[in-house]
A protein has these predicted regions:
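Tandem CBS (Cystathionine beta-synthase) repeat/Bateman regulatory domains
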Residues: 1-131
Length: 131
């Protein structure tokens, strides 16, 4: 099985022009540890609560920045035709709960770890998809 067959194509993301207030609103939802920032179909980066704290501590004027300005552009990604085993390896290497899926610079969605593990376990045991 490959990444394309398991990805979530409509995840909750932030537009590049989102305000810090919009970023904070998303990051304060339960179970949200970070947010991906996209500009159209291009993945710009990722923002964590620590990103906002650092910006405030550095004295940045949050009234004049966007999500794209705050985003860390170093986001581990995987291509849609890679194996799910490779995706899990990348997730383990970077301690990720989800992995961004990108094809030729175009953001396609995310691959969440928990359902991926359940799906792979079911496949290994010859069971139907548990979802």
């Amino acid at each position: 099985m490959i990444v394309r067959e398991a990805l979530v194509s409509d995840p909750r993301v932030l537009p590049a022009d989102a305000t810090p207030q919009q970023v904070a609103e998303l990051l304060t939802h339960p179970h949200v540890e970070s947010a991906l920032v996209v500009d159209g179909e291009r993945l710009v980066g990722s923002i964590t609560p620590e990103t906002l704290v650092s910006a405030i501590a550095e004295g940045r004027d949050l009234g004049s920045v966007t999500a794209a300005d705050l985003a860390d552009g170093e986001v581990p990604t995987i291509g849609p035709d890679e194996s799910l085993e490779e995706a899990l390896r990348v997730m383990a290497e970077h301690d990720l709960e989800r992995l961004a899926v990108v094809d030729g610079g175009r953001f396609l969605g995310i691959l969440p770890r928990e359902p991926l593990i359940r799906r792979m376990a079911a496949d290994e045991l010859g069971e139907t998809d548990p979802d």
